[in-house]
Structure formats: C-alpha cells, structure tokens
C-alpha cells in the first residue's frame, strides 16, 4: 500500500504527527507494535501520574484535620489504585484510536523496519510480512536506556 506519510510509532510524537499530517490532507498510516499511545501513555508517564495523584489524595487525607476536615482511617486500596491507573491509560489510548478513525488514519499493527528507499516492512504478530511505501516516513519509536561500561544502572 502507498501513503503520503507513514509514522512508525504511536507515542506522543507519532500520534500528533500523524493527526496533523492527516488534517493537512495527507494519506497517513501509523505502524504500532503494541497499544496506541506507546509506552508513555500505556505504561510510563500517564499511569505514573495517575498513581502519583492517588498518593497525593491520600497525603491530603492525612492532613485534612489541618484544614478543619475530619477524615478517619484513610487507607490505600492498591487494587483500586492500579485499576484507576489502567483505566486512565485505556481511556486515553481509546481517545487516540477515535482521533485516528476521525482523521482517516490507517493503523497497521506490527513491527516496522525500514528496508529500502521510502519503504517499511511490517511484521505482524503471526510473523507475516507486508511492505508499505510512503513519500515521507517519520520514525517516532521512542528510546530505550543503554547500559554504559563502568556505569551501573539503578
């Protein structure tokens, strides 16, 4: 299939680029190997902020008496905290899915690999390979930490 733009990765950089390009009239495809939104939205930044907000609310409850409010026995419900965190991430991922549909963006599930000039090979979960072509390609695959010699990771 041929597109004006292929975006590899649907994290914060990828999904914004895809949506804007579509709004400007381009035929856009996004290649994503996992959930829409990438690591930040699904497992990193957003769920972490949700967990921190729960901790903040518990902290506020612990100091409520300082503000003239009585709260007895405020305690965390870790299952509910985790469920809320996952719910927030899932809702935001579904929001990206909605925006992609609204903007006619094709989602291709699989691992993208640049193979030739203006071509991306995608391997899906079953191991099937397809080749897609675009005039422009944006690599928005995020990053991973790297172990450096003599510097232990913590």
Residue ranges and their predicted role:
Residues 1-11:
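Beta1/beta-strand and adjacent pyrophosphate-binding region of the FAD-binding site
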Residues 1-2, 19-26, 31-154:
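Glycine-rich flavin
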Residues 14:
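N-terminal Rossmann-fold NAD(P) dinucleotide-binding loop
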């Amino acid at each position: 299939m041929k597109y004006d733009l292929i975006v590899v990765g649907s994290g914060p950089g990828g999904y914004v680029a895809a949506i804007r390009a579509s709004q400007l009239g381009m035929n856009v495809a996004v290649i994503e190997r996992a959930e829409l939104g990438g690591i930040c939205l699904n497992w990193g930044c957003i769920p972490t902020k949700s967990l921190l907000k729960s901790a903040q609310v518990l902290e506020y409850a612990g100091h409520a008496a300082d503000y003239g409010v009585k709260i007895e026995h405020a305690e965390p419900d870790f299952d509910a905290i985790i469920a809320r965190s996952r719910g927030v991430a899932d809702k935001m991922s579904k929001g990206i899915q909605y925006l992609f549909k609204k903007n006619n963006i094709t989602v291709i599930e699989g691992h993208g690999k640049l193979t030739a000039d203006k071509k991306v090979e995608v391997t899906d979960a079953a191991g099937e390979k397809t080749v897609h072509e675009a005039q422009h390609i944006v690599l928005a695959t995020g990053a991973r930490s790297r172990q450096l010699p003599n510097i232990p990771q913590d």
